[in-house]
Amino acid sequence: MPLTPGTLLAGRYELLALLGEGGSAQVYRAQDGLLGREVALKVMHDYLPESDRSRFLREVRTLARLTHPGVVPVLDLGQEPEAGRPFFTMPLLTGGPITRLGPLEDAPGPLARFLTAAAFASRALHHVHSHGIVHRDLTPGNVLLDDTGLPRIMDFGLVALSEQTRHLTRSGVTLGTPAYMAPEQAKGGGVDARSDLYALGAVLYRVACGSPPFVGDSDQSVLYQHVYEPVPDPRDLNPAVPDAVARVLLWLLAKRADRRPQSGAALAHLWALARRDLWTTHARGQYRGGRARTGEHPDGPARVSDMQELWSVALPGEVTWPAAVVGEGDLVAVGTRGGQLVLTHTSGRPFATYAARDEVTAPATLIGGHVLYGAWDGTLRRVELQSGSEVWRHQARAEFTGAPTVWGGRLLAPSRDGHLHALSLRTGELAWAYRAGGSLAASPLVWAGAALQCDETGWLHALDARSGTPLWKVEVGTVHATPALLPGPPGTATLVIATWEGEVHAIGLEVQNGRAALAGEDAIRWTYDVEDEVWASPALTALDLPPDSGAAPDASAAPGGVVVVAGWGGKVRGLRLADGEDLWERTLDGRVTASPVISAGLVFLATEGGELLALDVRNGEVRWTCRERSGVQATPLAASGTLYVAFMDGTLRAYRNAHPEWRSEQEG
């Protein structure tokens, strides 16, 4: 007899709603009347044979042995009185399947959440395997998120204990889910912990890319591909997947078990290395912190109470707008009006100077041991850092003014004559070019497979980043400053554009048919007029505002982010991302063309009058200030606990919070 909402089990659990149903059981949302909380209740179907009852009870016993926070525990065990069906209760998970963390977007926040979840699930599997248990059926539906975004493994109905594996096969039937099944399991062979790691790799592949590694018209087609076909590179399906993440996924999906990571603990370590690679390359090497251009860097100075100059070096030329300091590993780079790109060690020691035939004011891009930089003579170069050799050179008809943007094995570069060029990253050959309606000064952004480019005649263009095909465009006003984009809930984002005339627009985006689209007929969520020219890009952070932030009285009621925008006249404002309401404002002593940079809850600013500041991003309070004789137009870099600033007179300085021993040496 089927159960219905309102049914009371064991005099304690009132069934509220059916959450899901499988071949052996139903899962309900239920109210625990004794403890006054909602739980998930799993009850076996009443028509199943005794063998399935044994499997159901084995799942309960298995869960009872596991105590890792990444495994859903058993809260209670009972029996439905009429048919004698066993049931057990578990915590109710409200975050949905792990696929809600994807597909991956090119911004630090979503990537960090993915890596945190991947490492947590890997450690949970290690705990499971250390008890001699193999799950055998990991799928996105069996890895659910809690309300903090951490994954919990559940549904151990096909669990294989090392001494009982032979009892869990049926003649002619392969148990498991084909889309996530290891090759040895697909062939009906023996399984072990590495089979689960393969399945977790397939699950995380789907999270990262939006689809599993293999799809087909039938289960047999999918199983065949798992056994015999090479795994498609995840970067081909979703170019936002970082190289470090792609490498781990492909390693997990090796056909031979002995070529995969050998334990969940080893896998968790690989995710930690991928996170380190993300922090050292994603945010520093590309202008404004990556392809989303949020202006937020993950590892800048967290303490600024005693920030002092660490070193300074003279550059062979002035440094002016729209230049920016970028970095990778132990190198920082900035271009000059003298026609050179200068690379310096983070210690202040010179590394290399690369020449151009004209000014190098567009921000460079450092990636994978190479540097990409454009000049005013219309040349764009790729140089190998170790040898200094030029890999290729592309000649355009006008100067390059925006930062080269690496995406999907290509390079997107805007030129002054209104063309957005897509070049092969490997060869420099032109893949496509798009002609906007006017000159381009802003750098492109990439989100959800779309290149977003503003021009100086007032239009925001959205293109298919692979083909250059126009998707849509919207009129926003003349734009010199590169916009910034902050992903929201999966499949959504907010794009913030500051126009030259002083209007700041927040535009809602969403994924439609795999590409970025305007969110609704009126996608402009709010507009704020700074009543000044704007040359600096806005900076965005997802930092939520606590009640004691000292910002606007109702700031705590509007979580979701902060926008920092600077007018050319020197007035800087903090706005709520949700609605554009004022949080704080501060007037600086000098014009602002350098874009603000956010890191560790601080916003770093520099003026043409030589004033450097660190403000609390929540309330605008000054945490550090310094004045130099020369002004700044280039966007600084906050990385590895250090602030790097290139001054208009051609001086590059590094600032860092002083260590006590260093300070005493300075004073002595």
UniProtKB/Swiss-Prot annotation:
ATP binds at residues 19-27, 42. Keywords: ATP-binding, Kinase, Nucleotide-binding, Phosphoprotein, Serine/threonine-protein kinase, Stress response, Transferase. Induction: Expression is induced in response to DNA damage. Its cofactor is pyrroloquinoline quinone. CDD domains: STKc_PknB_like (cd14014). Autophosphorylated. Autokinase activity is stimulated by DNA damage. Stimulated by PQQ and DNA ends in vitro. GO terms for molecular function: ATP binding; protein serine kinase activity; protein serine/threonine kinase activity. InterPro entries: Kinase-like_dom_sf (IPR011009), PQQ_b-propeller_rpt (IPR018391), PQQ_rpt_dom (IPR002372), Prot_kinase_dom (IPR000719), Protein_kinase_ATP_BS (IPR017441), Quinoprotein_ADH-like_sf (IPR011047), Tyr_kinase_AS (IPR008266), WD40/YVTN_repeat-like_dom_sf (IPR015943). It holds the Pfam family Pkinase. The active site is at residue 137. Its EC number is 2.7.11.1. Disruption phenotype: Mutant exhibits higher sensitivity to different DNA-damaging agents. It shows altered phosphoprotein profile and impaired DSB repair. Deletion affects expression of genes involved in intermediary metabolism, stress response and growth under stressed conditions. It catalyses: L-seryl-[protein] + ATP = O-phospho-L-seryl-[protein] + ADP + H(+); L-threonyl-[protein] + ATP = O-phospho-L-threonyl-[protein] + ADP + H(+). Coiled coil: none annotated. Contains an N-terminal catalytic kinase domain and a C-terminal PQQ binding domain. Plays an important role in radiation resistance and DNA double-strand break (DSB) repair. Involved in transcriptional regulation of genes important for bacterial stress response. Phosphorylates PprA in vitro. Belongs to the protein kinase superfamily. Ser/Thr protein kinase family. This is DNA damage-responsive serine/threonine-protein kinase RqkA. It comes from Deinococcus radiodurans (strain ATCC 13939 / DSM 20539 / JCM 16871 / CCUG 27074 / LMG 4051 / NBRC 15346 / NCIMB 9279 / VKM B-1422 / R1). The gene is rqkA.
